[in-house]
A protein has these predicted regions:
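Alpha-helix boundary/interfacial micro-motifs
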Residues: 35, 42, 213, 222-223
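Active-site phosphate/pyrophosphate-binding segments
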Residues: 2-146, 151-154
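C-terminal catalytic subdomain
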Residues: 95-203, 210-217, 223
Length: 223
């Protein structure tokens, strides 16, 4: 059990039941604890490569000038003519689903201060783009968008060619489900470009521990 070493209901339960206790450092806030035993122990149990995770995080910290985590804050401040009230994070990989949930906490606890702040929204591509894109495109222009994309080309199961033979959509022949995902994310980003939306794309060539460590570290420094 991981908890602070102080008299608390959780600490008492652990002691009374002779549980293995690991101390959680009281000076590390919840949103930053992902790199402490709170986040690392579950990661080890899940079989993740922790060395690669920390290596990726260190890469960003030691090369901040290359990754430029301060650019978003600078941009939002300089756009005085636009009142951004929402920060939309759209991830195009199921592997980043829980990263998105953590990002909401990170952003809210870091940015929401003194009756000020920008609300973070996590959208999952392509699922949420079908339910939310209408609002994003034709609604109020008060949102900044971050697309986190990866390479889906030629991945996943191949579409049944016979199904589309002789139809108006026979261009699906010889394509994979990954090809469809790739087309979806590229088309959405191109639409945002054509409409002059404020957005950025963070491209991750492979969703692995090394790149996840980079993404986590980058996000913490950014906020």
């Amino acid at each position: 059990m991981i908890t602070e070493f102080k008299e608390s209901p959780l600490y008492k339960i652990a002691k009374d039941n002779n549980c293995l206790l690991l101390e959680h450092h009281k000076d590390v806030g919840g949103r930053y604890s992902i790199f402490t035993n709170v986040g690392i122990v579950p990661a080890i149990i899940s079989g993740l490569n922790i060395d690669a995770l920390f290596s990726g995080a260190s890469e960003v910290i030691n090369n901040i000038g290359n990754y430029k985590p301060y650019d978003l804050g600078r941009y939002l401040i300089q756009k005085e003519n636009v009142k951004f009230t929402n920060n939309v994070l759209m991830t195009y990989s199921d592997s980043l689903y829980f990263f998105g949930k953590w990002y909401l906490q990170l952003w809210a606890e870091s940015i929401g201060k003194n009756n000020k702040g920008i609300t973070a929204i996590h959208s999952v591509g392509t699922t949420d783009q079908h339910s939310q894109l209408q609002l994003y495109l034709d609604g109020p222009k008060d949102k900044y968008f971050t697309f986190i994309t990866t390479d889906h080309s030629n991945k996943g199961i191949k579409i049944n060619n016979d199904m589309f033979e002789g139809t108006a959509i026979d261009y699906f022949k010889d394509k994979t489900m990954g090809d469809l995902m790739e087309a979806e994310q590229r088309a959405t980003i191109e639409t945002f470009k054509l409409n002059n939306f404020s957005f950025r794309e963070i491209y991750i060539p492979k969703i692995d521990e090394q790149n996840l460590g980079k993404l986590l570290s980058f996000s913490i420094i950014e906020t």
